[in-house]
């Protein structure tokens, strides 16, 4: 077998490559054609063929998307479909998987819608930063819609059930046809300029793209963007989108949901109202208590400054002054009495009788026995003076101070000089506590 440099593929590999090529080259396409061979098996998926006079292509629309179709697909119906090209690898079938399909009459409207939406988005009309918040408690609501449609019945029914105290003004308008957009725009501008309403609701029921086209009007979209009053848009069903939905401050999927967004359920408000009442009662009691305390303080101040209170104060001051005066007088009298007593004592100290008694005492001191006593004391003093003089010349006293008396043992004579003794001579030294024998050694004199 000859060698081949080319890559050899299996059918599955080839189909996978073809699928990648298709999906990469055609991410999203719109096709206008006629339906043929329409089938819907028990799975809920929708299979059919789109064809024109010269060609056809197999198509599939799976259940999550096919259930939202607003028409019944049937043989020969002309449609506008959007989807992605792909390849069913198991059979090698080339097909279109759709995510949207509508009747072909809406195709031009759809393209106009997409173009206007892109232009308004580029201008910033859909930006979240410019959208207003809904008030926490809506008291007055303007509803712009058809007075005979299902939408107004749904809105009023929900509002009456959830919050019957809400004041609602119905501003009737056409919601379909050539003049509907201009009428809705005019009502919106008048309601906004009045300043009467907390929120303006623009709503209608479901329908085809053509039925809902009034809510894709550029003038209406710009009026919603310019409104000072918050605007809620609830147009069609959950899968319907209009330009009013994109521009409005809040988009609700249905009219009923819009009504639920705007007001609270009165059953949920009852506990909140009761809590608020309890809090109000508590605040009232607190305020009343404070007011009563202030009144009591003012009454005390008034009583303190009343004439009767001032008279009582003066009376108390008079009594206190009387007590202080009495105490002062008592002190003065006591001091006077003390001075009298001291004067009496001084008079007594100069009494001749007391002076005479002193002289008598001195006379008794001159009695002979007293004279002898004084003589004895004088002699004793002289005796002690003589004893001190004798002690000063006593040799033993000198010895007691560390000196010695040297004598010759033979005759007891006192040695007074070193010249009186010879070397080798024995002497006696008298000390304070006894005597000792000593011998004279040769030495210098």
UniProtKB/Swiss-Prot annotation:
GO MF terms listed in the record are: exodeoxyribonuclease VII activity; nucleic acid binding
Q: Where in the cell is it found?
A: Cytoplasm
**Keyword check for Cytoplasm:** yes
Q: Which keywords does UniProt give here?
A: Cytoplasm, Exonuclease, Hydrolase, Nuclease
One of the protein's GO biological processes? DNA catabolic process
Q: What class of enzyme is it?
A: hydrolase
As its record notes, the protein acts as a catalyst of: Exonucleolytic cleavage in either 5'- to 3'- or 3'- to 5'-direction to yield nucleoside 5'-phosphates
Q: What Enzyme Commission number(s) does the record list for this chain?
A: 3.1.11.6
User: Could you give the subunit structure recorded for this chain?
Assistant: Heterooligomer composed of large and small subunits.
- Family designation: Belongs to the XseA family.
Q: Its biological function?
A: Bidirectionally degrades single-stranded DNA into large acid-insoluble oligonucleotides, which are then degraded further into small acid-soluble oligonucleotides.
Q: What is this protein called?
A: Exodeoxyribonuclease 7 large subunit
Q: Which organism is it from?
A: Xanthomonas oryzae pv. oryzae (strain PXO99A)
